[in-house]
């Protein structure tokens, strides 16, 4: 995995360019080898959110040891920064969450990495 502390990269997403960022999360073992169960918790506009998703281990940066059994560990999940929306940042997770789609709006302060304005690729 690339250096998780490096500045954001650029990636072409459909017709626009978006930054790559990371969001803090709690990480547990997944059902399969190379898979993690990820929980993202945050507060946005007075609403407490708790989202769960599965992610390939290449999309998750662990701060320390790997999770095992029931033990959760701190980490960050890689996201595509799609733009600013509704006072927050619209990001795309590597997989859909268990309670919504892959795109979620989070507070800007939650996203680590560069957040750039979207630029038409034409």
Where in this protein do the model-derived segments appear?
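Intrinsic N-terminal pre-sequences and regulatory tails
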Residues: 2-4
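Basic/aromatic-rich interaction segments and small domains that mediate binding to polyanionic partners
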Residues: 10-110
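Short, charged, intrinsically disordered terminal tails
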Residues: 112-122
């Amino acid at each position: 995995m690339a250096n998780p502390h490096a500045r954001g990269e650029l990636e072409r997403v459909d017709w626009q360019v978006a930054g790559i960022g990371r969001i803090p999360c709690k990480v547990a073992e997944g059902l399969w080898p190379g898979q993690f169960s990820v929980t993202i918790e945050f507060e946005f506009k007075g609403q407490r959110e708790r989202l769960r998703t599965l992610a390939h281990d290449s999309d998750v940066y662990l701060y320390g040891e790997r999770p095992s059994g029931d033990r959760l560990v701190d980490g960050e999940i890689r996201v595509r920064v799609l733009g600013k929306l509704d006072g927050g940042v619209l990001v795309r997770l590597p997989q859909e969450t268990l309670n919504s789609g892959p795109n979620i709006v989070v507070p800007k302060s939650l996203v680590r990495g560069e957040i750039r304005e979207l630029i038409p690729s034409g």
